[in-house]
Each structure stands twice: as structure tokens, then as C-alpha cells.
């Protein structure tokens, strides 16, 4: 995973042989089903033929967290954590891998604190 800079704030994906760019801050979460990844964001849902791991490498590692085999969440959009789920916009629940729950939640709070600290320095 790479760190965010001005050149990587957009995620480049190919949909029906056309390259499109999605602002990473606008992505809520990514969901993988086989070789199709659904990217849920402010502008709707984009379906991409790819592996989740390939897209994960292009995402800002400070902003995104892999919470199980099939999902990556944008920590900026997590509104709550209840039991084994992240609550996302649109009342969507993203499951947290049960055996790694403590570690994943700790990573979430660490990333969230780093992001908040970085935001305070900018403003």
C-alpha cells in the first residue's frame, strides 16, 4: 500500500474498457465477490473486474483498512462499530474478521487518530 500524496488522491480503474478516476476520499468501501470488486462511493457503485488486493495497493494506506478477505473500508466514513461490523453510509454494515477483531479495531483507531492529527495540522 502506498502513502497518499497529491498524485494518488484519485483511484484509477477501468470499467468497460474506459479508464475512470474516483476520488479516494469519496469512496466508502470496496467489496469483492470473486473477480468483481464493487466500489461504493458518493457517486454510486462502480463494478470493476479486478482482485481486491490489486486495488488495495493503489489506495492510501492511511485512509483505508482491510477488515476481512472481501472488504476494505475508508476509515473517514465509518460512523460506528457494533459487535463485528463497521457502520457505513446508507446503513450498510461491513463485517470485521472475527478472529482478528481486536487487531483490526486497534488499527482503525490508530489510523483515525493519525488522520485527525494530520487534519488538525493542515487547518
Predicted regions and their residues:
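Conserved binding/recognition cores within well-folded domains
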Residues: 1-89, 93
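An exposure/low-complexity boundary signal
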Residues: 85-114
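Inter-domain helical "communication" segments and dimerization helices
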Residues: 1-10, 103, 107-123
Amino acid at each position: 500500500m502506498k502513502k497518499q500524496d497529491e498524485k494518488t488522491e484519485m483511484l484509477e480503474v477501468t470499467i468497460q474498457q474506459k479508464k475512470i478516476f474516483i476520488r479516494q476520499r469519496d469512496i466508502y468501501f470496496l467489496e469483492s465477490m470473486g473477480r468483481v470488486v464493487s466500489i461504493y462511493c458518493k457517486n454510486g457503485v462502480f463494478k470493476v473486474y479486478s482482485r481486491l488486493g490489486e486495488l488495495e495497493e493503489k489506495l492510501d494506506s492511511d485512509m483505508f483498512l482491510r477488515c476481512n478477505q472481501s472488504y476494505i473500508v475508508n476509515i473517514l466514513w465509518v460512523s460506528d462499530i457494533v459487535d463485528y461490523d463497521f457502520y457505513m453510509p446508507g446503513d450498510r454494515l461491513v463485517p470485521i474478521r472475527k478472529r482478528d477483531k481486536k487487531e483490526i479495531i486497534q488499527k482503525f483507531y490508530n489510523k483515525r487518530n493519525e488522520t485527525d492529527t494530520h487534519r488538525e495540522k493542515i487547518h
